[in-house]
Swiss-Prot record:
Top-level taxonomy: Eukaryota, Metazoa, Chordata, Craniata, Vertebrata
Bias type Polar residues, positions: 192-212
Protein's recorded name: 5'-AMP-activated protein kinase subunit gamma-2
Species the sequence originates in: Homo sapiens (Human)
Residues that coordinate or bind ADP 1: 317-322, 362, 383-384
Residue positions binding AMP 1: 317-322, 362, 383-384
Keyword Hydrolase attributed: no
Tissues expressing the protein: Isoform B is ubiquitously expressed except in liver and thymus. The highest level is detected in heart with abundant expression in placenta and testis.
Biological function: AMP/ATP-binding subunit of AMP-activated protein kinase (AMPK), an energy sensor protein kinase that plays a key role in regulating cellular energy metabolism. In response to reduction of intracellular ATP levels, AMPK activates energy-producing pathways and inhibits energy-consuming processes: inhibits protein, carbohydrate and lipid biosynthesis, as well as cell growth and proliferation. AMPK acts via direct phosphorylation of metabolic enzymes, and by longer-term effects via phosphorylation of transcription regulators.
């Protein structure tokens, strides 16, 4: 009976549409429609909403706001065929990434085409697909050690500079994501810590060089697309002045395989080679010469920049060559004390030695390329090139042939190997093979110093009576005279002077003219020496190959660099 009464009430409500029951029923209908609209949309688009948070978990929130606040996939939904409620955040939110994404500067290259899949996608993965510097460690702005010493070079090398440059847009698609599988193991991170950009090894994937679709670019750093425009903007007239004095025999060398090492050096700055932590000793010109050389020995360094307080600038370098020149000029006999070494100040010695022919200190900016550094070292016939910040005036590091070649050798296995690396020394003609200066084991030290000064060389092979190379006496060995305070007696023999290193000396590092250049480079870098003695089958001296000879062959000779008639300032 209860059921009959219920049916009667239902009929009464239906038969009287103008009554209160009719109004209540209409409101119920309207409410039911509101409830079921989001359910239909969720079933109609299961891939969009169902894969995000679950189809039944937030159905009440989907009624009022179809887009979850802060969802990274709002930009994708706005492109769907379904009519969506307009929202001020539905269209322009694509560049906004999740908090863990390192890139926010390339919205333009991804608004051209919508993603193929409507599923949730990570923005970091999207940006990584067309930018080689997408890893968190490759962004200088997020790297903890990115601006430790010289923030200016880090800013100019980052992607955040001029993202709208047309050159960058055309080069974004040159390097696909697949090139990352050839990424080297970043040995520089272990050796140089954060001193070099984390993306340096990624530029030299073999697939990048061999890609037939690589567009020709005017910049010598065309194989590094993500930093080409930044490097071009960073090189000002002061840094690029040296390269303007170079001529190239053939412009095609820029794209040839033989110029791969030259392009490597052009794409890296001097700051990239500066270690995270190193020792740099600076001398004031009012310091006594004797104390300065003792300080070199105590700190284990071979050279130091000279600071003049009157000019408030660096005016030169004090090296072991200065020590040799002082001994060569003022040594008389073991009975006469070298007064000039004991009492002279550095500024006094410079005035006497240079005799008013003062030349400005040859230095280089941390923003200059390593190609500039190699050219400056070889052209000026110097062995040490101070890196000085032009803004603060601080000395950051001292570049050498040895350091530059070691940096280059770290990446050689990841670059295409030029054909000349498989040629031997005889075919390439690298080294010095005529008028070789040498000494004997019983040669006095003072005579060896005279040869250093007159021939302007840095090492002398020691040859016995049979002509066999048994040792080598270099300029660096002369500083041991200051360490042992035996510089007042230069009549001792070379053998006696070299006894201090007999315990750890492993012998002369040698080679022959039939060995290929690749073997020579590997041997001189591993041995950490400045030269190799070229010998024949009888172990007799044939020639000398130095670090400058190797850098000339690897970098400058393939570039066809010529010095113009004008002098470099």
């Amino acid at each position: 009976m209860g059921s009959a009464v219920m049916d009667t009430k239902k009929k009464k409500d239906v038969s009287s549409p103008g009554g209160s029951g009719g109004k209540k029923n209409a409101s119920q209908k309207r409410r039911s429609l509101r409830v079921h609209i989001p359910d239909l949309s969720s079933f109609a688009m299961p891939l969009l909403d169902g894969d995000l948070e679950g189809s039944g978990k937030h159905s009440s929130r989907k009624v009022d706001s179809p887009f979850g606040p802060g969802s990274p996939s709002k930009g994708f939904f706005s492109r769907g065929p379904q009519p969506r409620p307009s929202s001020p955040m539905s269209a322009p939110v694509r560049p906004k990434t999740s908090p863990g994404s390192p890139k926010t500067v390339f919205p333009f290259s991804y608004q051209e085409s919508p993603p193929r899949s409507p599923r949730r996608m990570s923005f970091s993965g999207i940006f990584r697909s067309s930018s080689k510097e997408s890893s968190p460690n490759s962004n200088p702005a997020t790297s903890p050690g990115g601006i430790r010493f010289f923030s200016r070079s880090r800013k100019t090398s980052g992607l955040s500079s001029s993202p709208s440059t047309p050159t960058q847009v055309t080069k974004q698609h040159t390097f696909p994501l697949e090139s990352y599988k050839h990424e080297p193991e970043r040995l520089e991170n272990r050796i140089y810590a954060s001193s070099s950009p984390p993306d340096t090894g990624q530029r030299f994937c073999p697939s990048s060089f061999q890609s037939p679709t690589r567009p020709p670019l005017a910049s010598p750093t065309h194989y590094a697309p993500s930093k080409a425009a930044a490097l071009a903007a960073a090189l000002g007239p002061a840094e690029a002045g040296m390269l303007e004095k170079l001529e190239f025999e053939d412009e095609a060398v820029e794209d040839s395989e033989s110029g791969v090492y030259m392009r490597f050096m052009r794409s890296h700055k001097c700051y990239d080679i500066v270690p995270t932590s190193s020792k740099l000793v600076v001398f004031d010109t009012t310091l006594q010469v004797k104390k300065a050389f003792f300080a070199l020995v105590a700190n284990g360094v071979r050279a130091a920049p000279l600071w003049e307080s009157k000019k408030q600038s660096f005016v030169g370098m004090l090296t072991i060559t200065d020590f040799i020149n002082i001994l060569h000029r003022y040594y008389k006999s073991p009975m006469v004390q070298i007064y000039e070494l004991e009492e002279h100040k550095i500024e006094t010695w410079r005035e006497l030695y240079l005799q008013e022919t003062f030349k400005p200190l040859v230095n280089i900016s941390p923003d200059a390329s390593l190609f500039d550094a190699v050219y400056s070292l070889i052209k000026n016939k110097i062995h040490r090139l101070p890196v000085i910040d032009p803004i603060s005036g601080n000395a950051l590091y001292i570049l050498t042939h040895k350091r530059i070649l070691k940096f280059l050798q770290l990446f050689m296995s990841d670059m295409p190997k030029p054909a000349f690396m498989k040629q031997n020394l005889d075919e390439l003609g690298i080294g010095t093979y005529h008028n070789i200066a040498f000494i004997h084991p019983d040669t006095p030290i003072i005579k060896a110093l005279n040869i250093f000064v007159e021939r302007r060389i840095s090492a002398l092979p020691v040859v016995d009576e049979s002509g066999k190379v048994v040792d080598i006496y270099s300029k660096f060995d002369v500083i041991n005279l200051a360490a042992e305070k035996t510089y007042n007696n230069l009549d001792i023999t070379v053998t006696q002077a070299l006894q201090h290193r007999s315990q750890y000396f492993e012998g002369v590092v040698k080679c022959n003219k039939l060995e290929i250049l690749e073997t020579i480079v590997d041997r001189i870098v591993r041995a950490e020496v400045h030269r190799l003695v070229v010998v024949n089958e009888a172990d007799s001296i044939v020639g000398i190959i130095s670090l400058s000879d190797i850098l000339q062959a690897l970098i400058l000779t393939p570039a066809g660099a010529k010095q113009k008639e004008t002098e470099t300032e």
